[in-house]
A protein has these predicted regions:
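Membrane-interfacial and juxtamembrane segments of integral membrane proteins
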Residues: 1-141
């Protein structure tokens, strides 16, 4: 069901708190998914772990993590904790293409040290650039 009335966007402080909490959760997920192959494969895993393979592994693990949570309720655990929900710009749940596009478009902001926060400060609705481009928006849940 589309949003019947405008819904408030979370403030920058709430988003930053959610991002900090999310980074701890993601670090734990990545740690587990790096330790398991090393335990199962032993020394062989160390020989296979080139920097490029590690980067692709991280990218794919994070892709699955975020896209799955966004498609199943619009919230990661950190977003639930801070009462933030991701919806399409018309208020409906995300479609798979939107979730994937948002994930891919968010990387320049991550690589540039969170430059997307500056955009959100200037945006009339307080949304990130990658949300505008992907047709998504963050709302208070």
């Amino acid at each position: 069901m589309p949003l019947a009335r405008p819904v408030a966007s979370p403030g920058i402080a709430r988003r930053l708190a959610s991002m900090c909490y999310e980074s701890l959760l993601v670090l734990a997920v990545l740690a587990v998914l790096f330790v398991l192959p090393h335990l199962m494969l032993g020394v062989f895993a160390q020989r296979m772990a080139s920097p490029a393979i590690i980067q692709v592994h991280c990218f794919l693990v994070l892709l699955v993590y975020f896209v799955w949570f966004w498609l199943h309720g619009g919230q990661t655990l950190a977003m639930k904790t801070w009462r933030i929900r991701l919806v399409s710009s018309d208020g409906l749940p995300l479609r798979p293409g939107q979730a994937l596009l948002r994930y891919l478009l968010s990387w320049p902001s991550v690589v540039l040290g969170g430059a997307g926060l500056a955009w959100a400060l200037l945006d009339r609705d307080g949304q990130f650039l990658h949300d505008r481009l992907a047709g998504t928006r963050l709302i208070l849940a």
